[in-house]
Amino acid sequence: MSNGPLRVGIGGPVGAGKTTLTEQIARALAPRLSMAVITNDIYTREDAEALMRAQVLPSERIRGVETGGCPHTAIREDASINLAAIAELNAAFPDLDLVLIESGGDNLAATFSPELADLTIYVIDTAAGQDIPRKRGPGLARSDLLVVNKTDLAPHVGVDAALLEADARASRAGRPVVMAALRHGKGVAEVVDFLIEQGGLQPCPAHSHGQ
């Protein structure tokens, strides 16, 4: 890509499955294109360390930024800390095709600055309750892709999965929704296909981009 890598923002509340989604995308695409990940944590680099332990990417392709008290500021009002991390990764890996930017745990109102992300994915958690899609925050309503995660838990938490999906789709004005159980791999292929199609990615047949 002549204009630099595709930048994909991944947002959603704490515990919804952002790091799991990041890991699964890396597992699917890292062997097929040059990619890197930036995680935003409030005071630690816990998410970056979790991705390193999962060994889905070499550690030098993972950057953890510490955002301080307001994680949404680092993805929206003042994205400089993330833009600097992207610039570092671009310098280190000039062939970079894709950068995933995982936001710190945020609420339904947090969104990514267009300056930072070309595409945005928002993750919500079935276990958070039946009414989550009706709360209609901008991340949920206006992200390019909504992932409703942990659908396998619906029967255990008293959630009607079909109604949850209907409400999620109703809140999206035609934008795509993926019903997923990311830990079990359900929904991952749809997310990857979305990134390839909407992001103009051209993954090679599987090979290693280790360095």
From Swiss-Prot:
It is found in: Cytoplasm. This is Urease accessory protein UreG. Facilitates the functional incorporation of the urease nickel metallocenter. This process requires GTP hydrolysis, probably effectuated by UreG. GTP binds at residues 12-19. One of its GO terms (cellular component) is cytoplasm. Keywords: Chaperone, Cytoplasm, GTP-binding, Nickel insertion, Nucleotide-binding. The keyword Cytoplasm applies. GO terms for molecular function: GTP binding; GTPase activity; nickel cation binding. Pfam families: cobW. InterPro entries: CobW/HypB/UreG_nucleotide-bd, P-loop_NTPase, UreG. Its main location: cytoplasm. NCBIfam families: ureG. Homodimer. UreD, UreF and UreG form a complex that acts as a GTP-hydrolysis-dependent molecular chaperone, activating the urease apoprotein by helping to assemble the nickel containing metallocenter of UreC. The UreE protein probably delivers the nickel. Belongs to the SIMIBI class G3E GTPase family. UreG subfamily. Disulfide bonds: none annotated. GO terms for biological process: urea catabolic process. It comes from the Bacteria.
